[in-house]
Structures are given as structure tokens and as C-alpha cells.
Amino acid sequence: MRILCTNDDGIHAPGLKVIEEIARALSDDVWIVAPELDQSGVSHSLSLNDPLRLREVGPRHFAVRGTPTDCVIMGARHILGEKRPDLVLSGVNKGRNVAEDVVYSGTIAGALEGTILGLPSFALSQEFSIATRDKPSWDTALKFGPQIVRKVLDAGVPKNTVINVNFPSCAPDQVKGIVVTRQGKRNLGFLKVDERRDGRGNPYFWIGFDRAAALDVPEEGTDLAALAAHYVSVTPLRLDRTDEAFSGKLGSILA
């Protein structure tokens, strides 16, 4: 099995080494194609107005000056040649990708691009807390990642579906199990615009997070609830975002 790995944290991110270890537990034919620079939050951006620079950083390890989407396309359609990958693994992201994160995440987008190309694809992310920010529980991803990917692959991944896996911020022996979840919804009151001034007095801004905002109270069955309870969250996400439930009513409204 030929595996293409990417991420959004960049070619030198520690989580990329973790995804490579997970991939090597499944196959010896592993290729790494990751962004030259950190691309967190770029979502499914595709570079159309800038050329892509490709740099080989080691055997089967390539850096692309572009987005995770660019990396998957470059890997599947150029670097790997005529022998296409059989699987795309994106991650392991430093930080969870749950709830509304799936819209912003470059990690999710890397896996979605694999799905668009007709390849079974997984996005993997490791949650951290304020206390473990500098040292996430990578061992948790290493322990549970290979078995989850293997079992889902053996069962078959439906067309146009990407598998979003999130590991809780705890040691492997503290994980209570693996649960299938749905995408949650968090309190977005924590988002804020942080205005500052440069040396010349001109304003500039950061999108920031208000740590004093009310904490999430996740609904049961969601990815947020699973992580809070120290479960590994596995969420199938569909490429087709059509709201089927509203389509009929919308048709009546517009008739």
C-alpha cells in the first residue's frame, strides 16, 4: 500500500513525524509531501496565482511552498508519478480539529483533497491543554492511530467521505475508548479581534481567542463531548455539504 502523508503545520512539525510513524505501521511505501511553512487555518486554499516551489528535503520527503491542498495534488499527480497513492493521511495536527474547526483546518482540507481525488483519506489531530501545549500526548496518537486507520480501511471508506480522527489530551492508558461522533458546535464568543499599534502608530490586528469566555458545554454524541471525556473521536465527514433536509422546503419556497 502506497501512503501519501501531509499536514498543515509544516515540513518540520513534530506531528508530521508522528503521522509518518503511523503510516509506517501500515506500509513501507510512505511518502511525505508537506508545506514549507506553517499553513494552519488556510482551509482548502488552492494556489492559483503563485507558482509552487518544490524542495526535496530527504528520501521520499518533499516540501512545497504552498497549502496542504497543493501538497496533496503535487504528491498524487506529480511526485509519486504514475503509481498513485492508495491512502492519504493528513496530520498529526497539533491541536484538535472538531466542531467549526473543520471549516478552517488545513489538516482537514488535506484529507478532503485526497477524497476529491478518489483516495481513502484520514485527518488526524492531537488535542492539547494549556498545560500540555508544549508537549502534546503524541503517544496517544501513535497507539490508536494505526489500528483505527487499519480497521476503517478494512471495512471500506465510502466515496466522498473523509474520516476525521481526534485524540484526547491524555496519556494512552487514560483513554477510555474509541467512539464514532458527529460534528459538534462550540461557543464562538471566544473569538476576538486584537488591535495593536506598530512602531509608527499604525494599527494592525490579530484574530485572537478570549480565554475568559464561557467554556463549551458540548452535546452528547459530539466530537467535543468525546474528547472532554477522554475518548478518541472518529467522525465521518461528507464532501457533499448539501442540506437535504431543507432542500424540499426550499423548493416549495422558490416554486
UniProtKB/Swiss-Prot annotation:
Belongs to the SurE nucleotidase family. GO terms for molecular function: 3'-nucleotidase activity; 5'-nucleotidase activity; exopolyphosphatase activity; metal ion binding; nucleotide binding. It is found in: Cytoplasm. One of its GO terms (cellular component) is cytoplasm. Binds 1 divalent metal cation per subunit. The gene is surE. It is an enzyme of class 3 (hydrolase). Its EC number is 3.1.3.5. A divalent metal cation binds at residues 8-9, 40, 93. It comes from the Bacteria. InterPro entries: SurE (IPR030048), SurE-like_Pase/nucleotidase (IPR002828), SurE-like_sf (IPR036523). It catalyses: a ribonucleoside 5'-phosphate + H2O = a ribonucleoside + phosphate. Its cofactor is a divalent metal cation. This is 5'-nucleotidase SurE. It holds the Pfam family SurE. The keyword 4Fe-4S does not apply.
